[in-house]
Amino acid sequence: MASLSPPDLGSVVHTAAEEADILMLQELVSIESLSRHESSAVAFLRGAMAARGFRVEQDAVGNAVGTIGSGERHIVLLGHIDTVTGHPPVKIEDGVLWGRGAVDAKGPLATFVAAASAAAADLKVKVTVVGAIGEEAIHSLGATEVANWPAPAFCIIGEPSGWDSLCLGYRGSLSLIYRLQTDMRHTAGPGESVAEQAVAFWNGVLAEVAARNEGAKNLFESIGPGLRSFNTSSDGLSETAELSIGLRLPPDLDVPELLQRVEALAGEGQITVDGMQEGYRTTKQSKLVPPFLRAIRDEGGTPRFKVKLGTSDMNVVGPNWKCPIAAYGPGDSSLDHTPEERIDLSEYLRAIRVLRNVLISFS
């Protein structure tokens, strides 16, 4: 890991514990951890948790796992340690930490570690923090492994909701590959080229989605189509078109029926499912909600509820565990995956205090 420049925290005076929490996040963000290349960050996180009194391990797929406290009830704080590509310089200026993962989602993950260790003396429950690998990849390998655990009493997903907000749901996703191969033809001859047929298929998908979205109350309840890539190739005898397609799915959508319709639109083309996560949503009546409302208000905030248009590991563990679940963490999610990714450290510290009080309330 590269040496870190001294942070510019502005005029704010922090306690020793707050400075340690800021340094932990800065160091974690400084370690590049693309999906499938998280081992260095996992090793750092395990060390940081061990230094704070966690019982640490690395599971079969490479997740960082740390447990603190004891009791009959088990609380899982499931964050992810991988990031998307791009590693802008890590710096702290005027109380703001810049760098890939500061928001999505090392900020929420560091919040989990800091809050659980701060609550340790008052815990009467077992709290497990997971720094999961592979969340930014299609198959969410880390969360898929964790989903095999016995269901906990509560689960909190580490994603940037904002310190004063709770996220109650995420759309799902369906990743598809469309492939069409035809015999070569002269461009002056009759008929459509393989590229033209692929375009016609994609336009058919857009029309199908538009028809299904009629009457949707909002974007969360609609299907979101995306064309990720379009490639054509030829070997002189045949020509091939391949499209990579992503569909964002609202909860309760009949995914097999939608897939059947897409396959019909493909005609002679082949459809391969490259990954699928169904949408998932909980309610304001969840037993997780009241402790967060109290803790946010105690910090001077006005609690808000959100649902997100993307996916998270809630989509993976929620259907398996069926326990009270929500996503929480500091940060502005509109900065996810952008060159401007950054987190206000005062918000980070506030989120730590909120989550600490939530964990103590379970005791």
What do these predicted regions represent?
Residues 2-102, 123, 322:
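Acidic/His- and Gly-rich active-site-bordering loop/insert found
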Residues 2-9, 57, 160, 174-363:
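Metal-dependent amide/peptide-bond hydrolase catalytic core
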Residues 87-88, 164-168, 230-235:
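Short beta-strand/turn micro-motifs at beta-sheet edges
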Residues 75-77, 130, 154-156, 228, ...:
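Hydrophobic/aromatic beta-strand patches that form the interior of the parallel beta-sheet core
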Residues 110-175:
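Acidic/histidine-rich catalytic neighborhood of metal-dependent amide-processing enzymes
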Residues 97-105, 304-310:
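Active-site nucleophile and cofactor-binding loops and adjacent substrate-binding regions
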Residues 45, 109-119, 143-146, 198-202, ...:
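Buried hydrophobic packing segments
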